[in-house]
Amino acid sequence: MPKKQKKLSFLLFLSGLLLVACGKEGHSQIVAINNETEYEEVVAKDVAYLYFGFDDCPYCKEFRPILEEELMETGQIAYYYNTKKRVNDANYDEVLDTYGVEFVPLLVRLENGKAVGSVNLDTVADLPALLAAE
């Protein structure tokens, strides 16, 4: 094989490897809620996990990697309710009141729209049990 073909083959291989690696990195077990309709769809599920927080919250930055790791291990998905981005939603106060959100981060387990358990940064050790609850 000529030198030019070897170089081209090698570059194509590296490009493919890079594409595969980048594609895997973008996948997250945490899905953002972008509007009120998406929120309603989440709470209509039999079982769902609702994660309250905001991007520049230092406690959320500590909590989120722990949450992501546990979600990956259990195959669960959490729906992210960004308390700063959703503040103008008509149902914002109702949502926070319904789940007793006084501070973030907070992960709430919902069963048929009702909160049946939650964890925060102080109780993060209980996260595996919350995600494994039947």
Enumerate the language-model features and the residues they cover.
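Proteins that catalyze or organize thiol-disulfide redox chemistry
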Residues: 2, 23-49, 56, 134
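Bacterial N-terminal signal peptides that target proteins for export
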Residues: 2-10
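C-terminal motif of bacterial Sec signal peptides marking the signal peptidase cleavage site
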Residues: 18-21
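Non-catalytic, surface beta->alpha helical segment in thiol-disulfide oxidoreductase systems
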Residues: 108-134
